Regions:
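Accessory interaction regions appended to the cores of large information-processing enzymes
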Residues: 1-311
């Protein structure tokens, strides 16, 4: 069982961290992690009874009020077609100002894709992203419109927006960016100006490129008695699962399915109830796949409301 744990009182975060470290030293069957991606502390334990024991210890021994939530889903963002964006950053407030203008094209990246069509490719950086997927950054500038010394700053701006995607703030992946034109000023152009221009040009293009939200899909293996196969398969299908196969393993049948992670919350309890505790399962990450349009729309709306509140 995995849950998100947080303190009820905002000033107790450090106390909760200390309590979790103490519990980890006492109990090797539990562990926790602080996820910078979904901004939650995740508590992993053996089941609901184990979770209740841990909660009792935190509340009665460590004297902390805590709450448990459903873990957020680590979505990804990408694009489905080619688009272009441009942005001029200009700021003047006495003395040297800030100026940069960037034109770029973005495309969905795939292995073996040809060079950018209609552009003069001068150099290319292939970046393996920490969160999976790639960013291909191409210098296609001709005529010295932008000094090459500013390209790393444009890349920084692109990367910053890919770490906080335009749709839901999720990581973006598998995109080729080709910078092909722009303008600079002898005095006012600097690294921060081109970083800002690159970020906004990329964001503009991303929104125009039919962006797609991706969700993690997990391979789920369920081991159950033969007479319970129908019920287990039916339950997996209600969770948007796609059953891929079934085979005998000893006295059990192994059912293999691909299921969205968002549908697997509290599956351990559901499976135990469905099979009277006679089944077990494993699950591991498989791939990312597009979410349904309605799901994407709702998540984008929620993100927009959150950003308004933050502002």
């Amino acid at each position: 069982v995995t849950v998100a744990i947080s303190s009820v009182n905002k000033g107790d975060e450090e106390k909760l961290s200390n309590a979790l470290h103490t519990l980890r030293e006492e109990d090797a069957s539990m562990h926790f992690e602080v996820s910078s991606e979904i901004k939650q502390t995740l508590l992993h334990c053996q089941g609901e009874l184990h979770l209740k024991v841990l909660q009792w210890k935190i509340e009665h021994i460590h004297k902390l009020d805590v709450k448990f939530d459903k873990p957020k889903i680590p979505y990804r963002e990408t694009i489905s077609r080619k688009a272009e964006g441009n942005y001029r950053h200009k700021k003047q407030s006495g003395g040297a100002g800030q100026f940069a203008e960037v034109y770029l094209r973005i495309e969905p990246w795939y292995d073996g894709m040809p060079n950018p069509e209609g552009l003069n490719l001068r150099s290319k950086d292939e970046i393996d992203l920490d969160w999976g997927g790639k960013l291909i950054f191409c210098n296609c500038i001709v005529g010295g419109a932008i000094d090459t010394r500013f390209l790393p700053s444009i890349l920084k701006g692109v990367m910053e927006k890919m770490q906080n995607g335009p749709l839901t703030g999720s990581y973006a992946r598998d995109i080729r960016v080709s910078v092909y034109d722009g303008k600079m000023h002898d005095v006012d152009s600097n690294d921060i100006s081109f970083k800002i221009a690159g970020l906004h040009a990329f964001r503009q293009a991303f929104i125009e490129a039919d962006p797609q939200l991706l969700e993690p899909i997990y391979t789920v293996e369920v081991f159950c008695p033969d007479e319970m196969v129908g019920a287990v398969m039916g339950d997996l299908q209600t969770r948007m699962g796609v059953v891929e196969g079934m085979q005998a393993e000893g006295h059990f049948e192994k059912i293999t399915a691909k299921v969205p992670l968002a549908q697997m919350h509290q599956y351990s309890s559901s499976l135990r109830s469905l099979t009277q505790g006679r089944a077990r399962f494993n699950m591991f990450f498989s791939s990312y796949a597009p979410v349904a349009y309605e799901v994407q729309r709702k998540l984008m709306e929620a993100h927009s409301k959150h950003e308004v509140l933050q502002d």
